């Protein structure tokens, strides 16, 4: 018997191939996506309606509902419920037809674009939600650029078609001209505002006429007719029917052709139209998404691209969250499964520290709700209790050592000293700042003078600072004071302290340390930055922090 025949007949080989088949079947059923949008475009509403159609919830709760009504499933933090906005990412898993869908709900505010980027690092697809009356808005543009950095497929859903809005052709042109992204309308709206009658499905050449459900709480009823059915003339006003026919001819004549490869490369966005509040077009979007979306694929690592059916388990931490359950003051690490099969009670290696961990209470995440998880496959997101071991970007694995590409920090634009005016609250203050730093709620920096111990909060936007203060008071019982600093630009120094010492004294900049003890130069404005770059061309300054590996952060 040859070596190949012997190996193929061995129990070990059969066990591995059986496991790989199991993983491959699970991957075929997995889809995941993150939703990005400008505030008030209806992101939380769309999220809830997708859960409604997936059977994960029985009744949708509006964010701005009265207190007697249900709160939104994806908005679990008290401040989110008060303000009606998402300020932290959430994972929601549900089943639809034969697929398991992992939905990552991202913050709806550009001040939290770094949290959005971390979430997109775990996502295989993105859904860009737009208000049909407004089109592209500033924060959508910024979040789109974050998507582009990840080179993932982007699906576009134009929402609020039941309200007066802009011309659909004009909205498509805006995406193509301003984002440099080609568009393909998968369905097309019939009317808008109070004359919105439904959509035409170009895939199946069918007209879907919708009836409103009561406040959009239940699944919408759907009358489906074939294109050319004589009944259409009785159900749709003549001018709307003629307009639909004219616009469809225009799309077929000069519109971009459907190209699945271009979609997967992030060069072509499939476009959908509907109204999440009244459930118009939501299920059509979901069904097309399952057909077009990227399934979990290979991930780049320190030992090469790792295919999802590699039999050893591996994954990376893309988010940390403290106090999801205020009763237990817990800390959860969100992990994206990349390869193999995850099983409860398995023992894994923690790449950054080299330590061995037993994962005894893994959790399936659904907003604030959790249940114990027995297994998970590539593309799934799992929750692990975090006793202070994990940092964002950490890799866990079994088998041979590997590390996935880390998740970088971006240049903050607002800086302030964080003061604790009450010495008796030092312990909860330190604990709160440390845990909020771990989860990436804000970046923490320190004076280069070791005698000064006050933390410097560094954020993309003002709302981040407000959230940190709110959470310190609400979750840790600590009132704090902010002392604004006059900086607006931060740059990391390539080569670290050694390079900085060789350069000597620098003017019009202040040197601080980041969480990992690396030098960061703070500038009052871009002009001061350009001046330093001109005076010291030997300095390599980076707007994105190098990824920390094998290091421990400075203690608060």
UniProtKB/Swiss-Prot annotation:
Which amino acid positions bind GTP, per UniProt? 37-44, 105-109, 159-162
The protein's location, in the record's own words, is:
Cytoplasm
Which keywords does this Swiss-Prot/TrEMBL entry list?
A: Cytoplasm, GTP-binding, Nucleotide-binding, Protein biosynthesis
- Any one GO cellular component localisation term in the record: cytosol
Q: Sorted alphabetically, which PROSITE patterns does this protein's record hold?
A: G_TR_1 (PS00301), G_TR_2 (PS51722)
The answer to keyword Cytoplasm applying to this record is yes
Where in this chain does the record put each tr-type G domain?
28-297
Q: One Pfam family for this entry, by name? A: RF3_C
GO MF terms listed in the record are:
GTP binding; GTPase activity; translation release factor activity, codon nonspecific; translation release factor activity, codon specific
Q: Can you cite a GO biological process for this protein?
A: regulation of translational termination
Return the similarity comment.
Belongs to the TRAFAC class translation factor GTPase superfamily. Classic translation factor GTPase family. PrfC subfamily.
HAMAP family given in the database record = Rel_fac_3
**Role:** Increases the formation of ribosomal termination complexes and stimulates activities of RF-1 and RF-2. It binds guanine nucleotides and has strong preference for UGA stop codons. It may interact directly with the ribosome. The stimulation of RF-1 and RF-2 is significantly reduced by GTP and GDP, but not by GMP.
Q: Which PANTHER family match?
A: PEPTIDE CHAIN RELEASE FACTOR RF3
Protein name according to UniProt: Peptide chain release factor 3
């Amino acid at each position: 018997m040859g070596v190949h025949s012997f190996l193929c007949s061995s129990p070990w080989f059969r066990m591995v191939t059986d496991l790989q088949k199991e993983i491959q079947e699970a991957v075929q059923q997995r889809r995941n996506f993150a939703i990005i949008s400008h505030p008030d475009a209806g992101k939380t509403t769309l999220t809830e309606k997708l859960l409604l159609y997936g059977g994960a919830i029985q009744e949708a709760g509006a964010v701005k509902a009265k207190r007697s009504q249900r709160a939104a499933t994806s908005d679990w933090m008290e401040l989110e419920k008060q303000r009606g906005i998402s300020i932290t990412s959430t994972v929601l898993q549900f089943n639809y037809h034969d697929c398991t869908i992992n939905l990552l709900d991202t913050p709806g505010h550009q001040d939290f674009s770094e949290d959005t980027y971390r979430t997109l690092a775990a996502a295989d697809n993105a859904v860009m939600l737009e208000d049909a009356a407004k089109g592209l808005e500033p924060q959508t543009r910024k979040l789109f650029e974050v998507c582009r950095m990840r080179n993932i497929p982007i699906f576009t859903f134009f929402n609020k078609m039941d309200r007066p809005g802009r011309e659909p052709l004009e909205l498509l042109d805006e995406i193509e001209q301003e984002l440099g992204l080609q568009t393909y309308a998968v369905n097309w709206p019939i009317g808008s505002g109070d004359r919105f009658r439904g959509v035409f499905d170009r895939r199946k050449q069918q007209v879907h006429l919708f009836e409103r459900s009561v406040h959009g709480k239940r699944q919408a009823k759907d009358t489906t007719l074939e294109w050319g059915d004589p009944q259409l003339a009785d159900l749709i006003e003549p001018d709307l029917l003629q307009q639909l026919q004219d616009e469809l001819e225009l799309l077929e004549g000069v519109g971009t052709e459907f190209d699945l490869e271009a979609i997967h490369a992030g060069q072509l966005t499939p476009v959908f139209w509907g109204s999440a509040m009244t459930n118009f077009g939501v299920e059509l979007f979901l069904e097309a998404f399952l057909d077009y979306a990227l399934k979990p694929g290979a991930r780049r690592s320190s030992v090469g691209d790792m295919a999802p059916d590699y039999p050893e388990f591996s994954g990376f931490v893309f988010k940390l969250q403290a106090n999801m359950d205020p009763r237990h003051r817990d800390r959860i690490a969100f992990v994206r499964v990349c390869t193999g099969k995850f099983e409860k009670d398995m023992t894994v290696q923690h790449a950054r520290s080299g330590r061995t961990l037993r994962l005894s209470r893994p959790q399936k995440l659904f907003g604030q709700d959790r249940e114990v998880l027995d297994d998970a496959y590539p593309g799934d997101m799992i929750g692990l209790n975090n006793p202070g071991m994990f940092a964002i970007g950490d890799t866990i694995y079994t088998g041979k050592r590997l590390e996935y590409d880390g998740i970088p920090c971006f240049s903050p634009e607002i800086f302030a000293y964080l003061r604790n005016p009450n010495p008796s609250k030092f312990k909860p203050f330190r604990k709160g700042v440390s845990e909020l730093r771990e989860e990436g709620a804000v970046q923490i920096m320190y004076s280069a003078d070791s005698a000064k111990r006050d933390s410097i909060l560094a954020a993309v936007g003002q709302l981040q600072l407000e959230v940190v203060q709110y959470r310190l008071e609400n979750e840790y019982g600590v009132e704090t004071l902010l002392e604004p600093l006059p900086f607006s630009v931060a740059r990391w120094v390539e080569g670290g302290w050694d390079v900085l010492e060789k350069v000597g004294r620098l003017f019009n900049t202040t040197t601080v340390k980041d969480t990992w003890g690396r030098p960061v130069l703070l500038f009052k404005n871009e002009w001061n930055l350009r001046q330093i770059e001109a005076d010291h061309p030997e300095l390599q300054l980076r707007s994105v922090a190098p990824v920390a590996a094998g290091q421990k952060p400075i203690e608060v």
